[in-house]
Swiss-Prot record:
Subunit structure: Microtubule inner protein component of sperm flagellar doublet microtubules.
Name this protein carries in UniProt: Sperm-associated microtubule inner protein 5
One Gene Ontology term, aspect cellular component: nucleus
Localisation: Cytoplasm, Cytoskeleton, Flagellum axoneme; Cytoplasm; Nucleus
Pfam families: SPMIP5 (PF22573)
Keyword Nucleotide-binding set for record: no
Tissue: Expressed in testis (at protein level). Strongly expressed in peritubular cells and Leydig cells and weakly expressed in the cytoplasm of spermatocytes.
Gene: SPMIP5
Function per UniProt: Microtubule inner protein (MIP) part of the dynein-decorated doublet microtubules (DMTs) in flagellum axoneme. May serve to reinforce and thus stabilize the microtubule structure in the sperm flagella.
Coiled coil: none
Key words, A-Z: Cell projection, Cilium, Cytoplasm, Cytoskeleton, Flagellum, Nucleus
Length: 234
């Protein structure tokens, strides 16, 4: 089965055709002669465009190849660097914080410094008022940064280097306290007792094994019994 032929390829147009005709809307009346003229003009322009496109393809194919100035890697690297620096989406993310001198975008109804406490908005547009408010706020901020900040000692007359002397009541209380010996010192001595602090005042008890060498020492210590004369006197 052969494919159907393109409609209106050959003139004249079939009588009674009421479909689309190129350039017919630019004519005054849709007559049959005007329809034939419009279709003929459209065919000529289409053929002329095809010939120009064919000539361009031939010129490109026969043109001598240009010598590359840089390598392909250098060109791709330059394009990638340019994309990172000047891409619109990256610029929006990088420069989100705008300077104070720049007024807000039209329709922005957020906070505007110095707008309610000054007369910058009297008889001016919103953009001019916003620009003046931001400019005044920036000047106040810069002036506050350059101002001399007085230190705490200069404002309240307090010196941080000098230590405050203790009050006389504290000194009197310290004089009334007794001076106890320092037991944390290992070789310290008590001035009241006149001996080292760790010395036992009692005489050490010795077992009787040293006096009786014939009796084996069991490691136990026994008290000597009192004599009958001492017990009678007691």
């Amino acid at each position: 089965m052969e494919p159907s032929k393109t409609f209106m390829r050959n003139l004249p147009i079939t009588p009674g055709y009421s479909g689309f005709v190129p350039f017919l809307s630019c004519q005054g009346m849709s007559k049959e002669d005007d329809m034939n003229h419009c279709v003929k003009t459209f065919q000529e322009k289409t053929q002329r465009y095809k010939e120009q496109l064919r000539e361009l393809c031939c010129a490109v194919a026969t043109a001598p190849k240009l010598k590359p100035v840089n390598s392909e890697e250098t060109v791709l690297q330059a394009l990638h660097q340019y994309n990172l620096q000047y891409h619109p989406l990256i610029l929006e993310c990088k420069y989100v914080k705008k300077p104070l001198q720049e007024p807000p975008i039209p329709g922005w109804a957020g906070y505007l410094p110095r707008a309610k406490v000054t007369e910058f908005g009297c008889g001016t547009r919103y953009t001019v008022m916003a620009k003046n408010c931001y400019k005044d706020f920036l000047e106040i901020t810069e002036r506050a940064k350059k101002a001399h900040l007085k230190p705490y000692e200069e404002i309240y007359g307090v010196s941080s280097t000098k230590t405050s002397a203790p009050s006389p009541k504290v000194l009197q209380h310290e004089e009334l306290l007794p001076k106890y010996p320092d037991f944390s010192i290992p070789d310290g001595s008590c001035p009241a007792l006149g001996r080292p602090l760790r010395e036992d005042p009692k005489t050490p008890l010795t077992c009787g094994c040293a006096q009786r060498p014939s009796i084996p020492c069991s490691g136990k210590m026994y008290l000597e019994p009192l004599s009958s004369a001492k017990y009678a006197e007691g």
